[in-house]
Amino acid sequence: MAGKTLYDKLWDSHLVKQRDDGSALIYIDRHIIHEVTSPQAFEGLRLAKRKPWRIDSIIATPDHNVPTTSERKGGIDAIEDQVSRLQVQTLDDNCDEYGITEFKMNDPRQGIVHVIGPEQGATLPGMSVVCGDSHTSTHGAFGALAHGIGTSEVEHVLATQCLVAKKMKNMLVSVEGQLPFGVTAKDIVLAVIGKIGTAGGNGYAIEFAGSAIRDLSIEGRMTICNMSIEAGARVGMVATDEKTVEYVKGRPFAPKGAEWDLAVEAWKDLVSDADAVFDTVVRLDAAQIKPQVSWGTSPEMVLAVDQNVPDPAQEPDLVKRGSIERALKYMGLKANQPITDIQLDRVFIGSCTNSRIEDLRAAADVAKGRKVAATIKQAIVVPGSGLIKEQAEKEGLDKVFIEAGFEWREPGCSMCLAMNPDRLGSGEHCASTSNRNFEGRQGAGGRTHLVSPAMAAAAAVNGRFIDVRDLIQL
């Protein structure tokens, strides 16, 4: 009998009941909620005269709609948009009513859900974690079973602590070798998506493995797992190791004392067995990966910074040719145009993909002693949480960014999506450390280019894309 994959083990340990239709009922250990997908769920509970089943499993914070400027100091009443204001207030009201732990808008622990969960130790190895947000796969970096759910499922988990789900197939993405200098976790995951496409992971849980993945920090692994959904997979994960344990140790929600010792012992099994069989295996050579830049309207439309935008005339597949033509038109680019010739208008460093302290340090290393190019209308840096902001300010990173001409903001989802005041104007090109680049994602008519934090900072000071390795030294 073949061994089990990490996903198999996590699934089996949370399986409550297998159903005749092929679906199953699984138990949920951690439920994270925010202001956008939870209001309807709580209203559904009230209409059914139910209450949340397990209050201590839930943590909450507003992130999508909160302003990242000084406006937020005025509290909820200072939020200009009426819908955003109502959603943030409703989250507060619901959490207050049921006694749910919430890091409110001006709490120093507030931040993006997928940043604060791990930061607080609320995400632990071996857990099942859900949130009404597709980038919940981020938490899989801890050897956890984590994925996004819809609003009706948010209500179901609140009411029952269980979720109806169907087991996925297993995919292994193995990245072996040493990453070249200046190449990051973001470049790895963009390269993976470029290789398998945005539908490549459909129906799979992806385990990221190999020496290049093991060499990454936990923050880097979170970046990788965060964008599993852009590869088509709801679930992405990395096996637990000493780095995982060290990251979790001592955090507010982490086990203490004898419970900690028991947990660490149990976590040792959160790896795929040596004889486990995967349905699909994808391999990448880390040494061949270069800094990546997305050029089109899908994360799979991505190239190395030293390449040229594709020519649709060279694409034999008519469907793909049409997609390239539409993307070029929307993005305002020409066939065979060098990536380094793309003129930028704005730069955004932040999001649940790349707003952690490691990301800010990487961007600051590039920005230090330089100035944002005169052609850049705006360059903003948005920490993923209040605690990350505090740490960055202790290290003087805020001063580095401000002196270079960046705006230093309060935590939130910000320009990742056009649900708050931070957004692109029509036709504007943005170098963004976020995760999605489809039409209108950052604002109606906005043109998004996905890059790493270091590449975004390099683009800010250069005005166009440039290989960050041309600016920094070994």
From Swiss-Prot:
- CDD domains from the entry? IPMI
A biological process (GO) of this protein is: L-leucine biosynthetic process
Note on cofactor: Binds 1 [4Fe-4S] cluster per subunit.
Which residues take part in binding [4Fe-4S] cluster? Answer: 352, 413, 416
Which Gene3D superfamilies does its entry note?
Answer: Aconitase, domain 3
Which Pfam families does the record cross-reference, listed alphabetically? Aconitase
Q: Which reaction does it catalyse?
A: (2R,3S)-3-isopropylmalate = (2S)-2-isopropylmalate
Q: Which UniProt keywords apply?
A: 4Fe-4S, Amino-acid biosynthesis, Branched-chain amino acid biosynthesis, Iron, Iron-sulfur, Leucine biosynthesis, Lyase, Metal-binding
Q: Which residues form a coiled coil?
A: none
The EC designation for this entry is: 4.2.1.33
> GO molecular function: any one?
4 iron, 4 sulfur cluster binding
Query: Could you confirm whether the keyword Lyase appears in this record?
Result: yes
Q: Does the keyword field hold DNA-binding?
A: no
SUPFAM superfamilies per the record?
A: Aconitase iron-sulfur domain
Q: In which pathway does it act?
A: Amino-acid biosynthesis; L-leucine biosynthesis; L-leucine from 3-methyl-2-oxobutanoate: step 2/4
Q: Which cofactor does it need?
A: [4Fe-4S] cluster
Q: Its quaternary structure?
A: Heterodimer of LeuC and LeuD.
Q: Tell me, in a sentence or two, what this protein's role is.
A: Catalyzes the isomerization between 2-isopropylmalate and 3-isopropylmalate, via the formation of 2-isopropylmaleate.
Family from the record: Belongs to the aconitase/IPM isomerase family. LeuC type 1 subfamily.
Annotated NCBIfam families: leuC, PRK05478.1, PRK12466.1
PANTHER family in the cross-refs:
3-ISOPROPYLMALATE DEHYDRATASE (PTHR43822:SF9), HOMOACONITASE, MITOCHONDRIAL-RELATED (PTHR43822)
Instruction: Tell me the protein's name.
Output: 3-isopropylmalate dehydratase large subunit
Its lineage reads: Bacteria, Pseudomonadati, Pseudomonadota, Gammaproteobacteria, Pseudomonadales
